[in-house]
A protein has these predicted regions:
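Conserved RNA-binding domains used in RNP assembly and mRNA/RNA metabolism
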Residues: 1-81
Length: 81
């Protein structure tokens, strides 16, 4: 299953889907992914908005790998976002 998320970094606002595969009987939660030993999180079907650009250009990407150290805020996206 996947969860739609909003991610804020110093330079970008990212909206996309984090896929959380089942491991055994327990479904992985977003916090499990963020606290794992992996240093990157995969985000699919995402839109990146440049936060510091005057015209706030938005880019669409099928897939990005985001370094966890660059995340300022991450949360499930709201329906209206």
């Amino acid at each position: 299953w996947s969860e739609r998320v909003l991610v804020i970094t110093d330079d970008y606002e990212i909206k996309g889907f984090v896929f959380m595969p089942k491991t055994g009987r327990k479904s992985r939660l977003l916090s499990d992914i963020l606290n794992s030993s992996k240093r990157f999180v995969a985000i699919k079907n995402c839109k990146l908005k440049h936060r510091n650009s005057a015209n706030r250009v938005t880019e669409a990407h099928d897939f990005i790998q985001l370094n966890l150290d660059s995340i300022v805020l991450i949360r499930p996206a709201l329906q209206e976002e």
